[in-house]
């Protein structure tokens, strides 16, 4: 469990990489096929742009998370490896068609799209994102779509425009506990993120709402528990919890490696609050997103079947 109080990045990374963070890389034919399919379309993925440690695992399962609205972000968060720019390119009007072709080639039934923050656009990129989603609905009408969106700088109209596009899961990450947010996230606030999540839950009560946090940044156990309570109180249904891993020496250092037992503990805390928790050292927002979606759908179906008839 984590016990550091200071968020300042002055301490070095813990000396030893624990055994639970060592994994075999399942490279093979399927990985190569996924790699070729994505690169042939010239599509950025968060798997590559953010240096995700799960890329080989996911691509070996014919799954990937598409990065929409470019490969450079207008924010420079201390944990993220995506390139920063003050002058990003305009949204690509053909991006939806490219993602659809790639998703068809991979045989995706659950499509996950994340986005860079586009503070240069009036609606934060919501309209461009909706255009992509509408294209996917046309080209892959049976596929479900999960979107990991930015906070749109608190623009509720932009959020509602996105939610009206008929997505299966709305995901927006708080990323860390409230105390550490100013040191971890650029131009974002913990309370604004909670506000966006709560608004989504109230706007579409049947929508699956999702958020995620990283641990190992210097948070207290009590702060993680409070964050889970905050998410539950603001209408979130699914929460992912994973170990923060430093992409490079210019990023925020790791303060601690959280044990599998602690992840199990956080899972039990979240479940006691009614949350669906997916927690573990390698868990990321979109890691095994298709399986999480199916498990959540089965849980909701099971719960609804236990409810009394209204007649």
UniProtKB/Swiss-Prot annotation:
Residues 59-276 form the Radical SAM core domain. Keywords: 4Fe-4S, Cytoplasm, Iron, Iron-sulfur, Metal-binding, S-adenosyl-L-methionine, Transferase. One of its GO terms (cellular component) is cytoplasm. InterPro entries: Aldolase_TIM, Elp3/MiaA/NifB-like_rSAM, LIAS_N, Lipoyl_synth, rSAM. Binds 2 [4Fe-4S] clusters per subunit. One cluster is coordinated with 3 cysteines and an exchangeable S-adenosyl-L-methionine. GO terms for molecular function: 4 iron, 4 sulfur cluster binding; lipoate synthase activity; metal ion binding. Belongs to the radical SAM superfamily. Lipoyl synthase family. This is Lipoyl synthase. The gene is lipA.
